[in-house]
């Protein structure tokens, strides 16, 4: 069998690399799977992830085998990608991320680490073309300037392990899977 010329090999990246690029550019149908442990409440996860309990019926529809039973063992749940329009205040200025995670389980664990302050931050799945799906813990609103974002942060004082950075605002190419209650 004749091998393709070396120049062709360089122009055509390996299949696994092309698949990874395609995944980053493909709009997700789900936010992935999540292993709900015994004693964890599905309603709490849904409120944290989607910003509202209204997505609970959609989650249950994707998981017909879900058992709302305290004695049930761990349950793997498929979480649908429910698209929400970002509030106008988060489409300009800057956003403040207190951590970015590759999986929902990592992000949910970090969000729960905020304890009683967890409602003060938003566990937000975000998809951007070329970057794919990621999970951020965001300040619950956008900021007009970097200075305003840093000022909010100094009053909030996140945990020491928080990986704080500024993000560009949500734009037309960005998909947001969290319902914010700010204007």
Predicted regions and their residues:
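Non-catalytic surface loops within mature trypsin-like serine protease
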Residues: 81-83, 100-103, 144, 168
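LysM (lysin motif) carbohydrate-binding repeats in extracellular/periplasmic proteins that recognize
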Residues: 37-72, 109-122, 128-130, 144-161
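Primarily a LysM-type cell-wall glycan-binding module
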Residues: 21-50, 90-97, 101, 125-133
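Compositionally biased, proline/threonine/alanine/serine-rich low-complexity intrinsically disordered stretches
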Residues: 1-35, 69, 79, 85-90, ...
